[in-house]
From Swiss-Prot:
Native species: Homo sapiens (Human)
InterPro entries: Cdc37, Cdc37_C, Cdc37_Hsp90-bd, Cdc37_Hsp90-bd_sf, Cdc37_N_dom
Sites of Phosphoserine modification: 13, 120, 377
Function according to Swiss-Prot or TrEMBL: Co-chaperone that binds to numerous kinases and promotes their interaction with the Hsp90 complex, resulting in stabilization and promotion of their activity. Inhibits HSP90AA1 ATPase activity.
Disordered, as annotated region: 123-145, 347-378
Record carries keyword Translocase: no
Modified residues (N-acetylvaline): 2
Name the record gives this protein: Hsp90 co-chaperone Cdc37
């Protein structure tokens, strides 16, 4: 049975519509049509604004995801990573809101009555080109790392050559001859290389490689927006950038400067992290038999005891200890033993626990420990 309900709400008029004798029928139809067209145009305008807002939100989400990935590759700071993750979460929330509004707009459009302007539409008004389907599942972290390692081992020399280019024509020609370089692995390698150069204080070279890094990232972003393989669209990037489009060029330069600042920040964090690790290793090497750092123990000693270590005078140290409060003297000397600043003799090691020294009896009779790096033991 045919369902005729679809024709229940059709906003059309014909010559048999009854009108008042004093009203010009043609003018009435013309006014109705004009009002209907204006409503349709307003609706279309609102729909386009929603669509534009949704696309812009998706672009921001993609940009935030790119920065997050770049930060993870560069082993950036935790605070910056948390900030970007929070921003990405907020953007995804906004994206869902835009999509919901668009869906409501589509439902509203379907429920609108048909009219003479919408009863028929073009059947074919454009050509369709097959594109590579988007990946539904991302590779695991281990797979990505192995893929990156294999790619770098095979093409590291070519990637570095591309990183040293500067002219647009040279870069385009080199990528045309080596299209396998147009990929995410190349961009990741260039990012890490930039940070390494900044750590080595090769600032001018870092800025050169940073330029090529942004070139590759712009190509990848263009491919993502067009939903095609980057190797199929890198020439479009060079065509666009070489036409001296002011707005596009300003966007490129702004992103380049922002990227260089991020590289400097990552390099600074890496240096600070390396220094902390080095200091911790050196501290562990210095630890005495009781697990204390001799440098820290030395700095915590009273000034009169520090002077004894400075001049490496055992008798002077014993005299200073004998003049101190027995409890304080025992505390400081035990810390010196635990840190390795002092090595007690056999007599001292056999002393009963808790025994206090008298005014003329030093707490410990010690011998100097040789080979201390800080030269604070005697």
């Amino acid at each position: 049975m045919v369902d005729y309900s679809v024709w229940d709400h059709i906003e059309v008029s014909d010559d048999e519509d009854e009108t008042h004798p004093n009203i010009d029928t043609a003018s009435l139809f013309r006014w109705r049509h004009q009002a209907r067209v204006e409503r349709m145009e307003q609706f279309q305008k609102e729909k386009e604004e929603l669509d534009r807002g949704c696309r812009e939100c998706k672009r921001k989400v993609a940009e935030c995801q790119r920065k997050l990935k770049e930060l993870e590759v560069a082993e950036g700071g935790k605070a910056e990573l948390e900030r970007l993750q929070a921003e990405a979460q907020q953007l995804r929330k906004e994206e869902r809101s835009w999509e919901q509004k668009l869906e409501e707009m589509r439902k509203k459009e379907k429920s609108m009555p048909w009219n003479v302007d919408t009863l028929s539409k073009d059947g074919f008004s454009k050509s369709m080109v097959n594109t590579k389907p988007e990946k539904t599942e991302e590779d695991s972290e281990e797979v990505r790392e192995q893929k990156h390692k294999t790619f770098v081992e095979k093409y590291e020399k070519q990637i570095k050559h591309f990183g040293m280019l500067r002219r647009w024509d040279d870069s385009q020609k080199y990528l045309s001859d080596n299209v396998h370089l147009v990929c995410e692995e190349t961009a990741n390698y260039l990012v890490i290389w930039c940070i390494d150069l900044e750590v080595e204080e090769k600032c001018a070279l870092m800025e050169q490689v940073a330029h090529q890094t942004i070139v590759m990232q712009f190509i990848l972003e263009l491919a993502k927006s067009l939903k095609v393989d980057p190797r199929a669209c890198f020439r479009q990037f060079f065509t666009k950038i070489k036409t001296a489009d002011r707005q596009y060029m300003e966007g490129f330069n702004d992103e380049l400067e922002a990227f260089k600042e991020r590289v400097r920040g990552r390099a600074k964090l890496r240096i600070e992290k390396a220094m902390k690790e080095y200091e911790e290793e050196e501290r562990k090497k210095r630890l005495g038999p009781g697990g204390l750092d001799p440098v820290e123990v030395y700095e915590s000693l009273p000034e009169e005891l520090q002077k004894c270590f400075d001049v490496k005078d055992v008798q002077m140290l014993q005299d200073a200890i004998s003049k101190m409060d027995p409890t304080d003297a025992k505390y400081h000397m035990q810390r010196c033993i635990d840190s390795g600043l002092w090595v007690p003799n056999s007599k001292a090691s056999e002393a009963k626990e808790g025994e206090e020294a008298g005014p003329g009896d030093p707490l410990l009779e010690a011998v100097p420990k040789t080979g201390d790096e800080k030269d604070v033991s005697v």
